Amino acid sequence: MISNFTKIIFFLFISASYSQNNFFKSHPYATLGRSEALTASASAGDIDSDGDLDIIVANGRHWSEQNEVFYNDGKGFFRRSKLLGFERNTTYQVPLADIDNDGDLDIIVANDRIENQVFKNDGNGNFIFDHYFGKKESNTRGLCIIDLNNDGYVDIAVANRKSQNYIYYNNTKGFFSDKKQFGPHGEATIKIASSDFNRDGYNDLVLANRNGQKNRIYYGPDFQKFSFLGDDNQETRGVATHDMNSDGFNDIITVNIGAKNNIFFGDRNGYFGNPKSFGKSNDTTMALAIGDLDNDGDLDIIAANNGQKNQYYINDGKKYRAFQFGQASSVSYGVTLGDFTNNGFLDILISNSGSRNIIYFNQSK
């Protein structure tokens, strides 16, 4: 449900200038993977139950490469790694989730034009291939892992760019065969995020669409009713949903190529007014992450860019301060947050396509 009402926000937005990065620093040993790997994204979680965050890296994009599992040494460095599975894939995402409710994190693999995969954790951080799901001809770009039918088990919403999007329901044993299509065939969806926007007790889906298509919100539990979000002239590459202004209602953040990025503020009825923009009109933002970088109780924004320095935006409760970090020459496809050093502050992992993936450690104290 979209309203033309322009919501009055309690804070002002950022200026067009960027400040020097003072919060995050890289380390020569805090890199992951090969410099020539075409990494699309990464996920973080404690896969071996040793108390620190490990990292799964999705490699390949359109080209066949091997995905990797990196194990944290307890100090934020990743000196041990394993290949995921025995074959190379054209992978875009590798989210972690406990799909069988056995207490450990499993891996779901989103592949381009080959079937998607499920790897189950043996409880010790080793991953065993379990099954395929999806169609070989699908252009899968993103996965949203969330319980969509309120049965207590996570399901999978699949973003298939310019082919049919699907929901795959969990059979309560971590197997995904029962599927439901939603939206029109040919919707150019890149990413999906989820929240209960209309507060009816069911999770809804918000889609980031490319190719001149408007973004959409599909409402659960049947995902037939939808509303548009944003303009039809934007190339949206990422979407997230969080309560950015601490009013108790989740908002929607979208990032775009060749246009400013946007925050759509939600209200108690699930309406979204005209957006507040951040960044510059020539930004080429490929991905975003949301988290409290400075532990001040409100949410900040991190943007990963293609051929530009990456950015983070610090929310001080009244405005956002913008900072740049990383190399302008990098093709950054993904951004992942996690406290990799267990010091109580979030660090930033940037997934680069054609150069090494880099961890930027939070210098806050």
Report residues per predicted region.
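Sec-dependent signal peptide recognition
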Residues: I2-F11
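Hydrophobic h-region of N-terminal signal peptides that target proteins for export
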Residues: F11-S19
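Blade-edge motifs of beta-propeller repeat domains
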Residues: S19-A37, Y71-N89, K120-S138, Y169-E187, ...
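Beta-strand-rich domains and repeat architectures in extracellular enzymes and scaffolds
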Residues: G33-G60
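Beta-propeller blade termini
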Residues: A40-S49, Y92-N101, K120, R141-N150, ...
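Hydrophobic beta-strand segments that make up the repeating blades of beta-propeller
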Residues: I55-G60, I107-N111, I156-A159, L205-N209, ...
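Short glycine/acidic-enriched loop and turn motifs that connect beta-strands
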Residues: G60-S64, I114-E115, S163-Q164, N211-Q213, ...
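Blade-level signature of beta-propeller repeat domains, shared across WD40, Kelch, NHL, RCC1
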Residues: Y333-K365
